[in-house]
Amino acid sequence: GWPYLQHRGGPAGFMKTLDEHTLGFADYSGNRQYVSTGNFLSDDRVALFFMDYPNRRRLKLLGRVRTVGPEEADTLALLEDADYPAQVERAFVIQVEAFDWNCPQHITPRFTETELAGLPRSAVPTAAVPVVKSDSISPGV
């Protein structure tokens, strides 16, 4: 079938490092389509795309994903965000197989209001700078 792309986002830190080669994140109730979960049943390959706009960096990451359910309560607890007001439905754990830092040449810097407020005035460009209202940096999964 066609390749599939699903945006996943959350507050900074929602993607957790479990060990040197493993990442994971909690999955909460959403649009009830379960497309990613269904796709992973037939093909566990995953590509993630992380953007760091203020530092003009992007990371492509390839790996194999597995779904974690209530039978692995300890893993779910590690990936849960205690401040997020929802129940964890499942988690995704990704075994990283490869990654690549891309060239920053065509990345337009963007800042959250919090990041912009923390910069010295001399560091803020005089031209319009895109400002993201939320403090979330979101990977595509």
Cite the ranges covered by each PLM segment.
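Binding-site signature for planar aromatic cofactors or substrates
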Residues: W2-V141
